[in-house]
Amino acid sequence: MSSVQSSQTQKNDDAEVFDALIVGAGFNGIYQLHRLRQEGFKVRLFEAGADMGGIWYWNCYPGARVDSHIPIYEFSIEELWRDWNWTERFPAWDELRRYFHYVDKKLDLSRDIRFGMRVSAAEFDEARDQWVIRTTDGTVVRARFFILCTGFASKPYIPNYKGLESFAGESFHTGLWPQEGASFTGKRVGVVGTGASGVQVVQEASKDAAHLTVFQRTPILALPMQQRKLDVETQQRMKADYPEIFRIRRETFGGFDILRDERSALEVPPEERCALYEKLWQKGGFHYWIGGFSDILTNEEANRTMYDFWRDKTRARIKNPALADKLAPMEPPHPFGVKRPSLEQWYYEAFNQDNVSLVDVREMPIVEIVPEGVLTSDGLVELDMLVLATGFDAVTGGLTQIDIHGTGGITLKEKWTEGARTYLGFATSGFPNMLFLYGPQSPSGFCNGPTCAEMQGEWVVDCLKHMRENNKGRIEATAQAEEEWAQLLNSIAGMTLFPRADSWYMGANIPGKPRQLLNFPGVPIYMDQCNTAAAKDYEGFVLD
């Protein structure tokens, strides 16, 4: 610890002390708060937003909705699901907010949450084995354990476009949408980016905008959502199966209740293969992505069969052949499914409308933003509203944006300059008593949020209970365990097609960010590794 840091730490001897300070009030954070309180720990949660919900507080743009179906995208706690009913198979942001309010009321969470508290810095007090945590408003607290539940999409990425601040119209990033809303009606709207939020904004803006221009770099291989309304009677009948559904989601690759076909796509006759693809297509959601054959994400030839089926189904919906070549090209831009597919309802049909146009920025790059709109190499696109659907500094950005100092004064950002280094996707050496959930080198982006919140969350709760029962005040991952974890992750990644795409899974969407697989492929294998380490007295950690 530096002398300046040590002096600052000593000045906060009178700060309130907690067993655990949690950052973030999404699924992970509130599950941790609930469970640690149940086990008798003194806990406080800091949330930067004015309400709970995590990403569903910040993502309130028109059309924003979850891509995991119901009942997978909710807690498995019977006290919660027994009396709650959804209105849609894939709920929108406002219904998800109502769900979080319901959870809050049921579990009495808000009394231990402080909203509007953005954590700006934290340093480890080696003399006391405590973290000293600071917020932007000057609040300082101490905690034995610093638990970061910032999610994988909490730091919006805004490209460094020349002249961006000069734009005279309205300009918003989808992850920072104004809480009071913004209207597309009668406006010339430009959307930069065609990931999940871009797809959803395009669908909504296409209905009301005077003209909509979509700036696309790489075509999104979007899947049909197959959205539908849900009634109370149907859900009440379904609830008899909820315990089994929640059991299954703990045992599948992505934490869903979707089982894959264990055969190779190449050993199945073409007619039978297409029949399965059609069945998955009609089910909607992620069924087509993760319910197919066992080698779709590991064998390029097998993968191509899935892309070709997707391409043919999608091109049939696009009237203009030239647009079809841009949106669903004959040759895949990357292997199917190695970028997280977005779910759509009428995305491709939107491009059949006279008020919607597409700009391929690989052919006509954005030169700069000017007061009147977007200047490309082909000329000016005049706009009244510019929407940046440009994603996030995913998985690591929410952690490294906090000025976190570990032992010896090194910051987390400095340590991860050449790439994230963790053990079990929970901890990193040099930062004792700091644990993160849904973060780097855990399933995170591959996993349904509530599934990970509960499975990772229980591991953390058990770890803290173990330390309390054995009078241990400090836990730290070893550098050797980190290295072995990286080797395991790299070996698994090398067996897949994921490194073949420039995706946020690989950190490739952020200029200068080290390229590495940021997510552990598969919940069951991951949890087996975590539980094995715990059973061996937390092998790979040093407990004092």
UniProtKB/Swiss-Prot annotation:
- The organism's superkingdom is given as Bacteria
Use in biotech settings: This enzyme offers a promising route for the synthesis of chiral enol-lactones, when expressed in an engineered strain deprived of enone reductase activity.
Report whether NADP shows up as a keyword of the record.
yes
Concerning InterPro entries, the annotation shows: FAD-binding_Monooxygenases, FAD/NAD-bd_sf, Flavin_mOase-like
Which residues are marked as site: Transition state stabilizer?
Answer: R340
Q: EC number(s) of the enzyme? A: 1.14.13.-
Enumerate the cofactors the protein uses. FAD
Which residues are involved in binding FAD? F27, E47, W56, D67, Y73, V119
Alphabetical keyword list: FAD, Flavoprotein, Monooxygenase, NADP, Oxidoreductase
Q: Does the keyword NADP apply?
A: yes
Query: Which GO terms fall under molecular function for this chain's record?
Result: flavin adenine dinucleotide binding; N,N-dimethylaniline monooxygenase activity; NADP binding
Recorded hits in Pfam families, A to Z, give:
FMO-like
State the protein's purpose.
Catalyzes a Baeyer-Villiger oxidation reaction, i.e. the insertion of an oxygen atom into a carbon-carbon bond adjacent to a carbonyl, which converts ketones to esters or lactones using NADPH as an electron donor. Besides cycloalkanones, can use cyclic alpha,beta-unsaturated ketones as substrates, leading to enol-lactones. Can also act on methylated cycloalkanones and methylated cycloalkenones with high enantioselectivity in some cases.
- What family does the database annotate? Belongs to the FAD-binding monooxygenase family.
**Protein name from the UniProt record:** Baeyer-Villiger monooxygenase
Recall the taxonomic lineage recorded for the source organism: Bacteria, Pseudomonadati, Pseudomonadota, Alphaproteobacteria, Hyphomicrobiales
